[in-house]
Amino acid sequence: MAFGTTAAGTITKEQTLLSIRRLPVAASTNIAKGNVLEQDAGGDLIVSPVGRTAEVNHYVALEAVDNSSGADGALHVPVAVAGHFVTVVADGAIRPGTAVVISGSTAGQVIAYVASSHAKNQVVGIYWGKEGGIVAKAAGSPYLESFTDAADFSPADAADGDVIEVQLVD
């Protein structure tokens, strides 16, 4: 059984020269921790849509914020910015070292960049690895369990639904 304890929306490597930002949330927007975000035309954050907006800065929500019934800018959300190593949710298979773009089917999640399908100016970051380990349970009595730790975000292939570490580049 695969095991991971780090939630999406967690900064995994402290960057002393980078700081998080608190940006306003657009009206009628519900943001989950770990969603990839971008600014709308008014400068308020929205969950990055499946349409993949080109040439925009991307952020990752570090907290959940529900502005479903609020006005533009009524609430703010702390976000990771370009340069941060942060966790997000994969929406498909991704190999380590691969650039990632917004998923075409799930807003706020990422998939592998494919040159024939995506523009370079849609890249959000680079996938480096995922946390986890293996829990093994003995087949017979006394049913001992062991855990092999891989908590340092080892460079393993990601699958749909995995919480993965990306370095934001845009």
Which role fits each region the language model picked out?
Residues 2-170:
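Glycine-anchored, exposed beta-strand/edge motif detector
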